[in-house]
Amino acid sequence: MRKTLKLEIRKPQYVVCTDITYAQVDSWYDHCRRDLKLDLIYPEDREDKVYPCIVWICGGAWLRMDKSAHLAYLSRLAQNGFVVASVEYRTSNEGTYPMQLQDVKAAIRYLRAHAKRYRIDTNRFGVMGESAGGYLTCMAALDQDSSLDVGEYLEYSSAVQAACPWYPPTDASAFPYDDVEKAAMSPESQLMGFNVMTHQKEAWDRSPVSKVTAAAPPFLIIHGTEDHTVPYSQSEKLYNVLEKEECDVTLLSLDGADHADLMFFQDEVWAEIVHFFREKLFREV
């Protein structure tokens, strides 16, 4: 049997590039250097088009992360008209905050610096992440302190125009730990470099809820109502502060969902995410 198809080109090819070095940082007691890398999914077609970029930040309690773990799902965003970058950042085993946020901002600057190569619209950046990555998503969107921009490509902005944190820790000063010893061993304390229960002011100052202003970009916050790792109230706090500042914010609650629940990977949730980023990043700027 033979078949012939006469086709019109209506969709681009989607290219996956892994392990792109976006920065080099000190390692092993500052004696050595190591690469920080990102994975990229971008459309390739015959037209000279550029696309909004969404930066994904993996979770893992700031203790571990795998930038490639969610590429299958992130490809959904690429197929809806976005460049998608999944970025590596240093964990709290390597150093304390704000090192991790500095890495995320460095990745965003790198992507802007190489926008032509990867067909990125430099004016349209979104950021999305889960849990620990949700915290970094919030901070990347809210904390515009110029001292956080370190390394290369400093002539480029690290600002983003939309944010979608999943089950993010938003107030490190208010986690419900039973006692000081448990708090000292918590992922939040390891990230900050101090006990968040005994240093509540310092913990607050490094929390997303303390960084909200009326200039915040649009937010879609997603959280399960039965989260036993990061309390649902953490997202409610951020939502309330953003709403008080009259910011563009939506809290999408997943009824009965626990932390990193399979509910987050259902079509209905991804439809909401795609709608949010298309609405916020495809509009006129």
Set out the residue ranges of the language-model regions.
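Alpha/beta-hydrolase superfamily serine-hydrolase fold, recognizing
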Residues: 1-285
